[in-house]
Amino acid sequence: MLRAVLQANKNGVPLHKLQAEYKSVTGEPIPFKDMGFPALDAYLKSIPSVVRIEVSRVGEVTCYAVACKETARIAELVAHQRSSKKKGGHQVNCQMRLKSTAPVSHFGKPKITLRQPGFTPPQEMMIRKPVPTPPWGKGNYFGPRTFEYSPQPIPQLFGVAPMQRHLPNMNRPERKVTLPPRFQREVKSPLLPTPITDSNANHTQSYKRVVIGSGQSDLPVIQNNLKELLNKHSNGLWLSKLPQLYKETYKQDLGGEVLKQVPSWTHICTVQKLVSSGHTEIVIYATTRKQQPSTKNIQNRSNDQAKPNVPVVLSTPSSPPPLQISGSIPKDELKEKISTILTKYSNGLWYHALPKVFEDMFKQKLPIEAFNLDSLTDICTVDLISEEPFKAILYGKSAERAVQNSNPSVNNNIPQKLHDREPPLCSEEPDMTMAPPPLVIPSEASPSVLVVELNSTNDVVIRYIGRDYSAAQERMEDELKDFCSKSSTAQVRPLRVGQLVAAKAEEDAWLRAQISAIEDKKIKVCYVDYGFSETVDITKVCKLGKPFYTLPFQATKCRLAGLEAFCDDSVIIKALEAKACGKILAVEILHKSEKPLVVLYDTSGDDDININAACLKELYDRSLSLQLKANLSFSNVTVTNVCSDGTLFCQVPSKGLAKLYETLQKVDGEFQFQQVTSHLYVSLPFCGKICLYHYKGKWARVEITNVHSSRALDVHFLDSGTIASVKVSELKEIPPPLLRDLISIPPQALKCCLADLPLNIGMWTPDAVLWLRNTVLNCPECSIKVVKIDEAMNMVHIYLFTSNNFPDLERSINRRITNEELLKQKQKDVFLNMSVSSLEKGRGGGGAPASQLFPSGPCISPTSVAKKPDMQQSSPVPSFNMPPALPLPRPGEHMDVFVSVACHPGHFVCQPWQELHKLELVMDEMRLHYSTTEEKPIALEKNKLYAAKIENNWYRVLVKGILTNGLVSVYELDHGRHELVSCRKVQPLIEKFMHLPFQAITSQLAGINCEQWSEETSIVFRNHVEKKPLVALVQTIHESTHPWERRVVAYIVDTTLPDTDIWIHELMTEYLAQFSKPE
């Protein structure tokens, strides 16, 4: 009957609603306690043939039915019974993952805390305490500091979605040792009126009572309703889910002000705060609940970050565990019992939970004299993670190595003492319940992995490469080899399936393995660090000592994004084996879970290859590809795009194009008659993903090429060759019934160039491109004649004709564009960045001579600067008010800054830290605006404001100079950088983007004077401040007419260390003193 209830819900049933659903059909709840199970989820996990349990990204547990023909009829009846009880209204979940933009790389967060004598705040002169390090700011006590960035709060309008971006090989950060969460200090959140909570501890806390407003006349009714809800959901409710559940149950909205007061109603509910990866979530329970949720369930709610598993015993603060002595316990016996407890909790035990665990296990009170850290140090390792002693973690002596493995900052070598131990001690049979700690997913942006093997794209076996992974495994295997070769009690007796052993492999290597089958004198083992199985002789098996349980199993599985629908396709599997198996690849982790969702990249060549996208292309139906040969002619051709370098994209009538139109019509029909739900929207954008975009009343296939932020991304139109920036919310998923049909059609945009014209010469002039676009893009029917096919460049050389000129070569577009009368006033500028001699060395084959393109005369140097603009277009620069000046602190005050550019101590550029999120929003708007606006030739003027496209982003710039080779020198007004860009990438800056003050603050370091800075000094200064969040203490402000000419003289302080402020001017003074000393 349970299967039938679940089958009637195609989208599954949330775990907290399952009892109600079951009872609404059968009239009675699921009797899991009568069957000997303490909780409902434990019973469901015992029947995997009936129920499949999944945990969503937000941590919600959902139950699905496992198919069974026998209950199909019952499921239909249940669905019919439930149809009358369904509540109307559907909600579309369009939440996106927050992504930070690309213009700057932020690492860490500055703290305005100056401890330098003379600048110490009054409150710190009284008492000095270590400055808490934010959970996202990881430090390294043993090496260079690293910084990570926590994005500024983004309005709810833009959704929430963490940044996921693949880093190119050259830009990938070095692997550095960082501290795990248990070494990081707590930080108070100004938004939550709760005490400090450690990031690894999920404690149940009661909030302080909040005064309720007088306008809440129906407050008793709301409180009674909440009592009913909490009693019904005995496993607790997420506070964020409460308004929706309340509205569904009582047909009333739960106001925002009431929701804020709910945690303070201690007479109704008990509050539990769960902290994971710097994010805080709140669960509320009825005050009469008998037991706290298990640690296992809490760990499952940590949805995105796999962490070292520290057991947490939850206890209500209002009833602390008793510490009275019930009887006299000998000291040796007491130590032995505590050691037994710590052995069971191999991953550590909270100090404050020891009395309760002791009483539960031995039915005795823990003597109060034993509840002392000093008396426990001889039997366990005490890890103080904060100044609060009750926040200590206790580890048994045998579990020390497990802690080292889970903490990348601790040396995780297998101890050298292993050789000195007695063989009987090391060869003791480990507890069968003992297991290695879970594998922690690397925190770096783009880690390296070795792809071991695969049977499905949803089960790809990988191994992480790095110091704390593959290198640690190699050290362990060396120790294991020495141990097994010296051990006199090597053989395992008895053998059991599932037992961990050491197995001898090729080349006398000993590897950790798990027994999967036993057959006479042969056993089948799975090498847990490599992910493959092998049958070995029983004599080649050795006991696995306890020290070798400390390193997590290195073989893990992942899922490949974008290939879920073709996970078992033989073509995909074969291509993936050829492109990935046995290779070390870079991986972009989109969703961290037990089996993370990833994108693989091959970075061994000059360009990064997206393995997921490359495998998807193997599904192309080659019969739908256009068959091209030299001298073939095609009519009814449509030119879909003209690029600035003269490259064209054409659609040629073919079988594939007809199939594409037919399939897209079916897509349109699917969207017209299908109800709009959240699964139709792209919720997880990533590079290489194929989806749909509605453009000019029609659906088009697009491939995501770059994800900028939570709102904007770049896409490539597969069938027109166009590249554009679009909003994420405008993308749709391909309907599953049509997914394979659309994926199997090769791209229908044919990349072409005009034959007999110079190739690879840079951009054409605006007039030439504009004439070509007006001539061919608006032509209803064009014709082409294939001259040559360049497979290396993926380019087709063609003669292009308009409708009435085929096949007269003299009237082709190729010849007309080189006609003297076409661009009479600007013949010398038809092509930019090109000399006459290079044209004469262009392609052969009867092309037009260079004299037809350029008049005779000397070649202009590319670097010569024009005194006046050489453009005479009619579009004027718009006139509007300048943005307001950026407010600066007064002398003697300080501000948080981000140093974007650092040349030397006499010149660097800062940005106000608190305003960076506003700048990112403006750049998002600029990207969306200019990507959808047609390029217009403008008359560029020196010292005027424009918008310029630099590396796929649009910036507010000031034109500093105009070169005759088509390049423009610009100054980025928000970042302080000088760049050279093409004149084609400069557009008018509209008033919409002038409200935010220019963010670049030109600065000079105070406290140090030098007329000329050496290159060595500049490098030292740059390494200490560039691309870092710091604190600036303003000394002097030099005002000017224009905001970009203002100059600030300030002290710069690095406050990222817990107890020490680094004053940059002192550091540079010391360096100059050392540098000036005679050798």
From Swiss-Prot:
- InterPro entries, sorted: LOTUS-like, OST-HTH/LOTUS_dom, SNase_OB-fold_sf, TDRD7_LOTUS_3, Tudor, Tudor_domain_containing, Tudor_TDRD7_rpt2, Tudor_TDRD7_rpt3
Entry keyword annotation includes Cytoplasm: yes
> Which top-level group of life is the source organism from?
Eukaryota
Where are the disulfide bridges?
none
- Signal peptide coordinates: none
UniProt keywords (A-Z) are: Cytoplasm, Differentiation, Repeat, RNA-binding, Spermatogenesis
Query: What's a GO cellular component annotated to this UniProt protein?
Result: P granule
Primary residence? cytoplasm
The segments labelled Disordered in the record are: 109-132
Q: Which Pfam families match?
A: OST-HTH, TUDOR
Domain Tudor: start-end pairs? 494-551, 684-741
Q: Which family does it belong to?
A: Belongs to the TDRD7 family.
Report the function annotation for this chain. Answer: Component of specific cytoplasmic RNA granules involved in post-transcriptional regulation of specific genes: probably acts by binding to specific mRNAs and regulating their translation. Probably required during spermatogenesis.
Q: What is this protein called?
A: Tudor domain-containing protein 7
Q: Which organism is it from?
A: Xenopus laevis (African clawed frog)
Gene encoding this polypeptide? Answer: tdrd7
